[in-house]
């Protein structure tokens, strides 16, 4: 089963690398859209690799605990950005909205970073196994909030191109 999981992650990372490289010569899109797409692909890649690394590190020697904590911190901090990047790629957002969302994402990342030291959102035990902390629902809320934002952006994009029957 682990080989299948590893192959799935490897294929996902490979696909994201192809998408990142395809942006380099794309002059048909605006610079900001290319930047958002690049951020989306890079974030998905980093999160996938961190998630895979965290799974692989479960139960490894205790000397790897700091690395395990760092990997989970990166993963949990960046994952909510996926929905934000994807939403902004699907339908343009006003700068104010983007700045507010990035501030919320930064606050979430700060909470995850604090959790690396306190264990409130997640912790790694003495046997180097990852566990959810008492405030893990905050991460779930942030991730689901970014997915709701993405769905709302899809709705706005559909509305923008909807034919109303007028002239």
Positions of predicted regions on the chain:
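Short juxtamembrane and helix-loop transition motifs at transmembrane-helix boundaries
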Residues: 1-3, 62-70, 130-135, 155-166
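Extracellular-loop-to-transmembrane junctions of the mid-late helices
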Residues: 2-11, 110-156
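Alpha-helical transmembrane segments in multipass membrane proteins, preferentially the mid-helix core
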Residues: 16-23, 84-89, 140-165
């Amino acid at each position: 089963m682990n080989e299948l999981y590893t192959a799935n992650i490897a294929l996902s990372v490979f696909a994201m690398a192809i998408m990142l490289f395809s942006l380099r010569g794309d002059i048909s899109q605006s610079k900001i859209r290319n930047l958002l797409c690049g951020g989306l692909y890079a974030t998905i890649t980093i999160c996938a690799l961190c998630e895979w690394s965290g799974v692989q590190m479960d139960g490894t020697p205790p000397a790897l605990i700091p690395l395990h904590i760092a990997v989970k911190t990166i993963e949990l901090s960046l994952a909510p950005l996926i929905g934000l990047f994807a939403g902004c790629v699907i339908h343009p957002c006003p700068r104010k909205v983007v700045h507010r969302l990035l501030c919320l994402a930064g606050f979430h990342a700060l909470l995850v970073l604090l959790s690396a030291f306190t264990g409130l959102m997640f912790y790694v035990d003495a046997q180097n196994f990852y566990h959810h902390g008492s405030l893990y629902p905050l991460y779930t809320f942030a991730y689901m909030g970014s997915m709701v934002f993405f769905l709302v952006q899809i709705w706005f994009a559909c509305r923008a191109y909807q034919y109303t029957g007028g002239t």
